[in-house]
A protein has these predicted regions:
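Conserved N-terminal structural module of periplasmic/extracytoplasmic solute-binding proteins
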Residues: 5-9, 16-113, 125-132, 185, ...
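Short helix-initiation/N-cap motifs at beta->coil->alpha
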Residues: 74-84, 204-208, 301-317
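Hinge/lid segment of periplasmic solute-binding proteins
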Residues: 102-170, 185, 346-350, 358-362
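Short, solvent-exposed loop/beta-turn-alpha elements that line the ligand-binding surface or hinge
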Residues: 119-138, 185-201, 248-282, 354-368
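Extracytoplasmic/periplasmic solute-binding protein
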Residues: 147-165, 169-171, 205-272
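Extracytoplasmic/periplasmic substrate-recognition and gating elements
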Residues: 155, 338-420
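Glycine-centered hinge/linker elements that transmit conformational signals in sensory
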Residues: 210-213, 254-306, 350
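Conserved C-terminal helix/tail region of periplasmic/extracytoplasmic solute-binding proteins
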Residues: 419, 423, 433-520
Length: 520
């Protein structure tokens, strides 16, 4: 595993609207009581209760049983915190000590609303390789992404957040069903994919994926081959698009198209010409080949045009689809449904596209994983217990506590440790183990961040214009997928057609404004 290649998903330029309401109570601030607002999805609250009790017990030299929720600490679950943090961080009277959220806007930094965490990063914690500062123990590039200029054009920088979890985004599959499917397609597959005439492993290439689609149709034509959603969920196709794009374009260095730059060169946002990368068109072409035929969605749920990603993942958990786009949280979110179905689910790597960049042998496709590491923890400037919150961040960043969080939640923390070493690993589900294997057995990672440039040279367009939230500037994923029904990838990305303005033409207009705004 290449920890030096471990980066954060750069969705940090997003604006935070002021929303009405709060968490569970107005009683947030209290001197001496640690208050944490957190996003409740995925991992629950038990691990936070555990950390708060054990941390505060150590601070107060008492037993964890003596630490009481509501008295010594307060946890506030807020499902709107991702886009609603401003109602906390702008309030001097209702500001928590710590926020754990999926996103943090860099626009809050020059406003002085986020406390610096350099002292936290420079504190030593225990690891299996001796004491290390958190800055050393965390992924270098993760630290860099959460270090920005105080404001564009100013001198001086500080680290403003701690990375919290690393979420591999990929394809889950129903292993119970997969191993019942006979291989009858004429498409050749790897010899290790089939045993006694039936599938025994997930497809490793797009060719094998197409083969099992045909086999699944012959086995049970009521079974949906690929679970995704067009309504509030088409963006999940980014998992496929980014992986196939990087495989054709090259990860750090150009692969098939030397004059166009690599995948990571795209995120430098050097000019509108980045949207002409052919690898991105190749990825769209592959999506179209798998999911669209005769201007209709195929290999998908019959009602995909009306489905949300939650509906798609629920149907997948019920055993109605063979594959589905999801993340490491899938099993926990749909635990009761999975238990009722009695079926086994696993996570697989996105199958390699033809012509993908290879390992040193020149034949085997590079094992790439697309990661979401935008989840972070930060201390608002108006917090009344800043030191307590910072000490809590230090406490949770030791290797033992990274392992403890993995044991309790199955989550992977973005630090230099192996979650498979946690004490509960042997009792973990095959799904969680497959997520760990996907993550730790990767040759490289894909995130939406310009890792080919130093932090001080990152474009202000990337930092402040929210460009990392969507690869296709000016078009959402539903528009892209709907347009793919009757347009070519090149028409979508570069040429346009009729009333459809290409992504490139939209970017030309945007770059004109950005150059004026930032003096580029």
């Amino acid at each position: 595993m290449k920890f030096t290649k471990f980066l954060l998903l750069g969705a940090i330029g997003i604006a935070m609207p002021l929303l009405a309401g709060c968490g569970s109570s107005d009683d947030i601030q209290k001197e001496g009581r640690l208050s944490i607002v957190y996003y409740p999805g995925g991992y629950g609250q038990d691990y936070l209760d555990y950390f708060c009790k054990n941390f505060l017990a150590k601070e107060k030299n008492v037993s964890p049983d003596d630490i009481k929720p509501g008295v010594d600490y307060k946890l506030i679950a807020d499902p709107d915190i991702t886009y609603g943090a401003s109602r906390y961080i702008t309030s001097k009277s209702r500001c928590p000590d710590l926020i754990i959220s999926n996103l943090l806007s860099t626009k809050a930094i020059p406003q002085g609303l986020i406390a610096p965490l350099d002292d936290v990063y420079d504190t030593q914690v225990n690891t299996s390789k001796g004491k290390k500062t958190i800055r050393e123990f965390a992924m270098t590039e993760a630290v860099q992404q959460y270090t920005v200029e105080l404001a564009y054009g100013q001198t001086g920088k500080y680290s403003f957040a701690m990375p919290w979890t690393a979420i591999p985004l990929s394809i889950a599959y129903n292993n119970t069903i997969l191993q019942k499917i006979p291989h009858v397609s004429s498409i050749a597959v790897g010899s290790d994919a089939i045993s006694n005439g039936k599938w025994v492993r997930a497809p490793k290439t797009v060719t094998e994926l197409k083969a099992i689609f045909e086999d699944a149709e012959a086995y049970d034509n009521r079974l949906t081959k690929f679970g995704w959603a067009a309504v509030n969920g088409a963006n999940w196709l980014e998992t496929l698009i980014i992986t196939w794009w990087a495989q054709k374009q090259g990860v750090d260095t150009p692969h098939l198209y030397p004059s166009e730059g690599s995948y990571y060169d795209f995120w430098t946002y050097s000019s509108e010409e980045i949207f002409k990368q052919t690898g991105l068109q190749d990825a769209l072409a592959q999506v179209k080949d798998l999911l669209i035929k005769d201007e209709q969605f195929v290999n998908s749920f019959p009602t995909v045009g009306n489905m949300t990603i939650k509906m798609a993942q629920q149907s997948f958990a019920e055993g109605k689809a063979l594959f589905c786009l999801t993340g490491d949280f899938f099993e926990k979110e749909y635990k009761s449904v999975i238990e009722q179905s009695g079926q086994e689910f696993k996570m697989m790597r996105v199958p390699a596209i033809s012509g993908a960049v290879t390992k040193e042998d020149g034949e085997t496709p590079l094992d790439l994983s697309y990661l979401n590491i935008s989840s972070c923890a930060y201390v608002p400037a108006y917090a009344v217990n800043k030191k307590l919150a910072k000490d809590f961040l230090v406490y949770t960043s030791s290797e033992d506590n990274c392992l403890k969080m993995s044991e309790m939640t199955g989550a992977i923390r973005p630090f230099s440790y192996d979650a498979r070493n946690n004490s509960g690993y042997s009792q973990m589900s095959s799904f969680t183990k497959s997520v760990y294997d996907l993550f730790y057995e990767s040759d490289d990672y894909l995130v939406k961040y310009p890792r080919n440039v130093s932090p001080e040279n990152i474009s202000p367009i990337y930092l402040y214009e929210n460009v990392s939230e969507n690869v296709f500037y000016g078009c959402n994923y539903l528009t892209i997928m709907s347009s793919l029904k009757n347009l070519t990838p090149k028409q979508i990305m570069v040429d346009g057609k009729g009333d459809f303005k290409s992504v490139y033409d939209r970017a030309v207009e945007a770059f004109r404004d950005w150059r004026r705004r930032y003096g580029l």
